[in-house]
Amino acid sequence: MVNTRGYTTLPNVEEPANNSQDELNSQDFEQAIGMPSEPPVYVEEMGMEEPQAPEAFSEKVQRFRMCFENNVVIPVKKNVVDPLAQMISLASEKFDLFLSKIGNVMVMRRIFYIMMMSIIAALIIASDRLPNGKARGSNGSFSDHDLLLQYARKSIDLSKIERDLEYISSMPHMSGTSGDAAIRHYIKESFDKNGIRLAGEEEFMAYSNYPGNVSLRVYSKDDTEGFDIPLNEENFNPMSHNGQLNNIPVIYANKASLDDMASMQDQGLLNGDFILLVHYGDYVFQQMLTAQEYGAKAIIFISEPYQDNKDVIQMKSVALPQYGTGDALTPEWEGSIRDPIDATEAKCLPKIPSIPISANQGDKILAILSDTGVKFSNNLFSGSLNDCRLDLLVQTAIRERHPVHDIVGKIEGSEQAGRAIVIAAPRNSASYGTMYPSFGTVVLLSLIQLYQEMVYKFDWKPLRNIYFISFGGSEFNEAGATELMEKRTEALKSEIYTIIDVGQIGIWDDSNNLEIQCHPLLVDLFQKNMTSRKFNVKVDNVHQFGDWTPYLAQGIPVAIISSPGVMNREHPIYTVEDKFDFIKDKLRDKKKGEVLSEIMLYLVEKSLELIDDPFIPFSISNYVDFLSTTLKDLQKECPDTVNFDEVFLGTTLWENTKLQFEKWKSEWTELMYGAGTYIEPTIIAINRWSWNYLLSLIGVTQCLEEGLMDRTFYKNVIFGPKLWVDKGDPLRSWTFPEIRDTIAIKDWSSVQVQANTLGTILQNTARYFLENKNLHGINTNEF
């Protein structure tokens, strides 16, 4: 038969001799094992092989499982698991035998288990890496700032900054207008989206004014007809005085400095009625006060050209903050407490009208003035009182009681909820305000986003509270910031230990510089770790008015982070040209973006240290050095009859305080980081909190409750503005204001009284530290 199945036929073999018997045995065997008596029938069909059915998936899985079990599981069980189990069982028996010699086996097992778990937990805590991603310091209690900053660097969203800025600067938004209402809603919505708890939207009533009717008519010598200079709503100074003047002589006064006015007075140019025509100076408030003091009936400010545009007008406030900030009609109290005073009694309001004009408009008047009188450094002449006369009308829309709003958000601290810092920025602008103040508002919103992302990502809380505030009413003599301070004076003085203002940050010039004005306690904080930055930092004392002024006046340390161009209000700030379209290309520039990212990271780093370092990072050493040096210079300005012994006794006590603090902090650092004390002992933590409490009160306790002589708004006897400030000498202009004002008028007996008062304040505040025996040192042997 033909082999059609392809298998090999077996070779012939010899058959067994006993054939019949084998057949019988074979049949019996087959029946015994259940085999069929006949072989199966194989059907041949056309000599073709049947195709095999495909193997099912479940069969493949079963075959793989069996293979894996045979080749892996069984060998591992046989060669590893079973021997290990035998070893563990043997060790357990030996261990139980050992425990039975000590006590009850079950009890001793549980004690051993607890000890082992405690050791493991301690090792995990000490490892700086916890399962939730939060990195703690080596003491098991403090956050890992490096980890937080690494995350912040990756999370800075420049596209969000651009989107926020484009919207916020898309409309004029003076306080109390519909534009401000829209921006406030946007900011509150941003707070809410970032999960920031809205601590409140504070509304205050304040003196405000808005563009109204203005007109200016010019008459040259012997001209009775004259000509009009067209004015519009851009010819407006916030806080300006209303008035109407007819046929009044005008003279040019350069920048109306004290020297300029003295020169003009010497030449008899300030006799009778006159209007001053001036270029904007560094301090508009001082120009206003100078004009009033010398008897001017009005003042007209000439704006500088912006590039080739000589038609731009800078709308600067003309309030007088050297007498105080806030609502002009409720000085030193929040508006709802008592009835407002009359506007004529308000010291911080100017008493003469003012308007700003463009360079082109100013040239029309300057062209009429003769080349006589005083010649100034810009080669312009004052002219004479007979050269030109003006009709001037200033009729702004005054609202004596109009709302301004502050928006306040908060992240609560985990350790010292009674201590806090504030990060703030102004919000309002007479125009679009892209470069200032809108960019500062956007920086504030971005900081909020970064902080809240760190809170969620790492389940993190700072040790102390942090407030984020968008101040309103800044163009109305810092009304929003001041009224908040006046409403909550005691609460803020007891809780807030630093105000950081980010409103003057910018990336618009090529200097890549940051100007930081701050209290001497904060100087070391802002100067350290600057080697790897893409920008330079210059730290100086506070020498500028702003939303921080009411807090400085009450002794709270402040820090103002500024870019030079914004700080000096360079063009196009305060003009209608300060629009998003002007700066969008700079904002999208890669290098500018890198600088902005570095600035944002710098702000996070420094604010993080302030709210999350175990110690409030105040440098008593720098503060003491500052006091000693500055007071020695102050003494040189006085005759020998003025005795400074009480003052220098105060600085000596502060030197002792410095040594005490440095000793305690050094011992604390050694205990926590050198001796391996992973958990801060409770008594040490309480003493550290006491140090923080005393540190936070240094500034507010160095104030006079009754305020400075003739300027009672200012309580701070060490830091604050003189009545007449000099931009070229910020240290003398903004330190020991009452004493320096009295030195200026050579009232030496009053200087002696004020020096003694200062000495008493320094001595008493130093003794707060020195008399606390718990803060003299740490006995590390006890821990």
From Swiss-Prot:
Transmembrane segments: 110-127
Molecular function per GO: carboxypeptidase activity
Extracellular side: 128-783
Name used for this protein in its record: Uncharacterized protein TRE1
Name of one Pfam family that matches: TFR_dimer
Gene3D superfamilies tied to this protein: 3.50.30.30, Transferrin receptor-like, dimerisation domain, Zn peptidases
InterPro entries: PA_dom_sf, Peptidase_M28B, TFR-like_dimer_dom, TFR-like_dimer_dom_sf
Glycosylated sites: N139, N213, N529
Top-level taxonomy: Eukaryota, Fungi, Dikarya, Ascomycota, Saccharomycotina
GO biological process terms held by the UniProt record: protein transport to vacuole involved in ubiquitin-dependent protein catabolic process via the multivesicular body sorting pathway
Residue span of region Disordered: 1-22
GO cellular component, one term: plasma membrane
Residues in the signal sequence: none
SUPFAM superfamilies in UniProt: PA domain (SSF52025), Transferrin receptor-like dimerisation domain (SSF47672), Zn-dependent exopeptidases (SSF53187)
Record-linked PANTHER family: N-ACETYLATED-ALPHA-LINKED ACIDIC DIPEPTIDASE, ZINC METALLOPROTEASE TRE2-RELATED
Membrane topology term: Single-pass type II membrane protein
Cytoplasmic side: 1-109
Comment field (misc): Present with 396 molecules/cell in log phase SD medium.
Keywords, sorted A to Z: Cell membrane, Glycoprotein, Membrane, Signal-anchor, Transmembrane, Transmembrane helix
Subcellular location: Cell membrane
Recorded name of the encoding gene: TRE1
Domain PA, residue spans: 241-333
